[in-house]
């Protein structure tokens, strides 16, 4: 009996040799082929890329073969490739879609498949539903054998991101950066750009190592410890990191402190609105900082909130002009470039913001906290049985739950999980406290997110939230 294949917020992922098998890759590729044949212009072909994980090159070859056997021409990456490079090629070559073999920031023993729409971004929920519906087919479609062409997907992409940022200004200011590829498919890309432009950088974890020794390729603490140490030791002005497939960003300030994706989003948003004055609305996911709301309000920009997953942000980018959209996990995109998150581009734009403001990353973050009030954020991943996970969500939704620890629940929201807004101290103009409980649909996992006006309050809410989930509070 065939294993069930479940699509999450960004495609399909599974454990290598358990769920992620070459047979299942063929099934997913067959479903994608059927979708393209029925809904897109198959003669325009599909772009296929892959990251630096175990089995990624072979899995990408299998995807290419299934598509070609269905009569769909394929351009297959000739090397490990950032996900946004695949999306860029899809849009600018007019392809019918793109496939990226990756498990993004997951541990070393995972892999997966992402599908990119013909517009050059994360497939919308409607597209993903159509692909899922095709999984039930007994066999992949067959057609007149099409050509598989191996191509360099990085060259034109690198030109494009360099044109989008002011590389001359970055080079002129003489800031020094530490650059961490986390052994992912962004290895050599950002460091190559900096080297060509004469930007001083210190490179770490650029080599190929699919075991990701000691880390998950996710640019958050504790996985950025080596980057933090490097920034301090080498006296860098900032540390820049990309995840396993280089579509997400993480950063470190000059003192070695971690700068989360929320602060990165806010630094870039404020810079774009204050300096660049680009048009468009602002989009954030349900689990992101509400400092974004304050910045958008100051500059008179409309704010949209979406469910969690960049595909929902991309969906909105298809409907209207979006200056900037992002999610909690470090995915940030811009309509005027691509309706896609891009770790490499955001690293360049962060360096650009530092250069134009003449300030280190830590100084830019401090400016935010001063102007818009102290905002601190925390996340806790609880690997628990499904029964406990479901029970916690039911209790959170229950009308009888009117407090979290010693704090009264002022209101609840249910867009994606259950969010409590809490009667907790704001320390003047600081963040209004909230806690979000969200159960994973594909893993034995419940994530707890919280924001508050102090680090201490964030930690208190994480502890109290975990006690609530486990039934001890």
Stretches found by the model and what they are:
Residues 1-2, 15, 111-234:
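Gly/Ser/Thr-enriched, mixed-charge loops and adjacent short helices
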Residues 34, 38, 42-110, 162, ...:
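N-terminal small/polar loop signature for handling phosphorylated ligands or for N-terminal nucleophile
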Residues 78, 133-159, 253-326, 333-334:
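Proline/glycine-rich low-complexity loops and linkers
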Residues 115-118, 250-254, 334-335:
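Short beta-strand-to-turn element immediately C-terminal to the catalytic PLP-Schiff-base lysine
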Residues 124, 203-205, 257-276, 343-352:
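Gly/Ser/Thr-rich active-site loops/lids in small-molecule metabolic enzymes
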Residues 238, 278-451, 456-473:
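Phosphate-binding and adjacent anionic-ligand microenvironments
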């Amino acid at each position: 009996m065939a294993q069930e294949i479940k699509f999450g917020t960004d495609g399909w992922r599974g454990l290598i040799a358990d769920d992620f098998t070459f047979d299942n890759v063929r099934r997913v590729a067959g479903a994608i082929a059927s979708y393209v044949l029925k809904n897109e212009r198959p003669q325009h072909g599909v772009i296929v890329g892959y990251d630096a994980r175990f089995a990624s090159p072979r899995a990408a070859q299998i995807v290419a073969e299934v598509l070609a056997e269905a009569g769909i021409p394929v351009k297959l990456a000739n090397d490990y490739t950032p996900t946004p490079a695949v999306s860029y090629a899809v849009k600018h070559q007019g392809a019918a879609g793109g496939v990226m073999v990756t498990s993004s920031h997951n541990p070393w023993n995972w892999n997966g498949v992402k599908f990119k729409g013909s517009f050059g971004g994360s497939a919308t929920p409607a597209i993903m539903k159509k692909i899922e519906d095709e999984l039930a087919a007994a066999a992949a479609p067959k057609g007149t054998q099409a050509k598989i062409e191996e191509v360099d997907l990085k060259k034109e992409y690198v030109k494009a991101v360099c044109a989008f940022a002011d590389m001359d200004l970055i080079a002129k200011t003489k800031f020094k950066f530490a650059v961490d590829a986390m052994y992912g498919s962004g290895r050599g890309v950002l460091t190559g750009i900096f080297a060509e432009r004469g930007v001083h950088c210190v490179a770490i974890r650029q080599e190929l190592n699919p075991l990701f020794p000691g880390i998950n390729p996710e640019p958050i603490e504790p996985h950025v410890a080596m980057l933090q140490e490097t920034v301090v030791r080498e006296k860098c002005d900032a540390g820049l990191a990309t995840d396993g497939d280089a579509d997400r960003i993480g950063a470190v300030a000059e003192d070695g402190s971690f700068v989360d994706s929320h602060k990165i989003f806010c630094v870039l948003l404020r810079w774009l609105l204050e300096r660049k004055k680009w048009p468009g609305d602002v989009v954030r996911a349900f689990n992101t900082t509400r400092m974004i709301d304050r910045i958008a309000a100051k500059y008179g920009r409309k704010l949209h909130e979406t469910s969690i997953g960049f595909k929902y942000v991309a969906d909105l980018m298809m409907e209207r002009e979006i200056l900037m959209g992002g999610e909690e996990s470090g995915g940030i995109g811009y309509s005027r470039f691509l309706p896609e998150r891009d770790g490499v581009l955001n690293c360049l734009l962060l360096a650009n913001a530092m250069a134009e403001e003449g300030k280190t990353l830590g100084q830019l973050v401090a400016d935010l906290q001063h102007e818009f009030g102290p905002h601190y954020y925390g996340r806790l991943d609880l690997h628990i049985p499904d029964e406990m996970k479901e029970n916690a969500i039911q209790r959170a939704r229950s009308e009888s739950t009117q407090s979290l620890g010693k704090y009264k629940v002022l209101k609840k929201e249910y867009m994606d999980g259950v969010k409590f807004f809490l009667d907790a101290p704001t320390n003047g103009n600081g963040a209004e406290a909230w806690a979000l409980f969200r159960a994973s649909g594909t893993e034995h996992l419940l994530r707890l997110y919280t924001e508050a006006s102090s680090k201490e309050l964030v930690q208190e809410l994480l502890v109290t939230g975990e006690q609530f989930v486990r039934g001890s509070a």
